[in-house]
Swiss-Prot record:
It comes from Galleria mellonella (Greater wax moth). This is Sericin-1. GO terms for cellular component: extracellular region. The lineage of its organism: Eukaryota, Metazoa, Ecdysozoa, Arthropoda, Hexapoda. Residues 1-115 are annotated as: Disordered. Keywords: Secreted, Silk protein.
Amino acid sequence: GSSGSSGSSGSSGSSGSSGSSGSSGSSGSSGSSGSSGSSGSSGSSGSSGSSGSSGSSGSSGSSGSSGSSGSSGSSGSSGSSGSSSSSSSNGSGSSSGSSQSSGSQGGSSSTSSSN
């Protein structure tokens, strides 16, 4: 059904390194979905290397999942800090979260799942 759950991606951090901050947050909720919130990692991820925190929240169906899907915080590790969180629910369910922060990440990973 249509849901109006909102959530904001909390946990930001600042890290003043240079590098390619590639936080992609492709929020592709298709169906009758009224979920708002910033899906993706927020915060300045300034690790030198490929910092690829991808939070592809692809809820298809009538789903109202929101929250911060992905990890954020001050990820100041050099190398590939790859916190990936693919939250994908098909059908009329709403699932989000499951933030798996791997690598040397010193921030807080917030898993907010509102059904």
